[in-house]
């Protein structure tokens, strides 16, 4: 298993306190595949350098995961199907 860092930018209309609990159903994808969610860090609302989907700001969330590559690929796919998710970025951490 490898370690990944996933950054998610969510629509700013969502309340920052409800973002982490609503992510739980997506994080179950990792848990069901014998992976682990090491850290969930909600950075809060931040302004963009340029508009993304006609939005000027978004709620940033950073996840640290340990899982297989297929699992993180599926998580990214499912997150991008959600209309509240503006953008995702998956990075594999170096050893």
Swiss-Prot record:
Any single Gene Ontology cellular-component annotation: cytoplasm
One BP annotation, GO: translation
Keywords for this protein: Ribonucleoprotein, Ribosomal protein, RNA-binding, rRNA-binding
Pfam family, one: Ribosomal_S6
InterPro entries: Ribosomal_bS6, Ribosomal_bS6_sf, Ribosomal_S6_plastid/chlpt, Transl_elong_EF1B/ribsomal_bS6
GO MF, any single term: structural constituent of ribosome
Transmembrane segments: none
Keyword Ribosomal protein: yes
NCBIfam families named among the record's database cross-references: S6
Family membership: Belongs to the bacterial ribosomal protein bS6 family.
PANTHER family: MITOCHONDRIAL 28S RIBOSOMAL PROTEIN S6, SMALL RIBOSOMAL SUBUNIT PROTEIN BS6M
Functional summary from the UniProt entry: Binds together with bS18 to 16S ribosomal RNA.
Protein name: Small ribosomal subunit protein bS6
């Amino acid at each position: 298993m490898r370690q990944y860092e996933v950054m998610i930018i969510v629509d700013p209309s969502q309340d920052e306190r409800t973002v982490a609990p609503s992510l739980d159903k997506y994080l179950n994808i990792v848990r069901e595949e014998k992976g682990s969610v090491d850290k969930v860090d909600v950075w809060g609302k931040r302004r963009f350098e340029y508009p993304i989907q006609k939005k000027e700001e978004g709620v940033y969330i950073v996840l640290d995961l340990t899982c297989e590559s297929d699992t993180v690929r599926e998580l990214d796919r499912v997150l991008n199907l959600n209309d509240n998710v503006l953008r995702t970025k998956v990075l594999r951490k170096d050893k």
